[in-house]
């Protein structure tokens, strides 16, 4: 006998695959945000070091103002990227939860299928044993005649 929930099991498998894909996609986006954040941090450190070098000795007001405005831009950019990173981490966590849920559903369906197959095998063995018992009883009765 065929497992009647097989189409549902297949849907669960496809749903799990979709969840895996979405999780990987979100993780790639998070990784790119983290790389961008690292690049901004590196650029900020370079700019601060440069301003410190240039600021020693004579001070050029134009250079100082443009450097500090660029630094404030970099700091603002870092805040924006950090907010995007936090948001993306939440999306990754949600995708991970969806994947865990999909795996549980698939494993439940597979367990149901496994139990169904065990019952079917047991029933088939019982039918076969019953048939063999009937054949044996028939042979015994034939031998008594």
Residue ranges, per PLM feature:
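Charge-rich amphipathic alpha-helical interaction elements
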Residues: 1-145
């Amino acid at each position: 006998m065929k497992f009647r929930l097989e189409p549902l099991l297949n849907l669960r498998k496809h749903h799990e695959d979709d969840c895996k894909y979405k999780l990987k996609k979100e993780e790639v986006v998070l990784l790119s945000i983290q790389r961008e954040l690292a690049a901004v941090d590196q650029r900020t450190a370079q700019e601060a070091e440069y301003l410190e070098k240039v600021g020693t000795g004579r001070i050029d007001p134009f250079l100082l103002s443009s450097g500090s405005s660029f630094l404030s831009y970099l700091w603002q950019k870092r805040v924006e990227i950090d907010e995007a990173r936090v948001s993306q981490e939440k999306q990754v966590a949600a995708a991970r939860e969806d994947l865990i849920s999909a795996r549980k559903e698939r494993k439940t369906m597979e367990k149901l299928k496994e139990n169904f197959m065990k019952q079917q095998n047991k029933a088939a063995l019982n039918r076969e044993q019953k048939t063999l018992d009937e054949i044996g009883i028939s042979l015994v009765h034939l031998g008594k005649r």
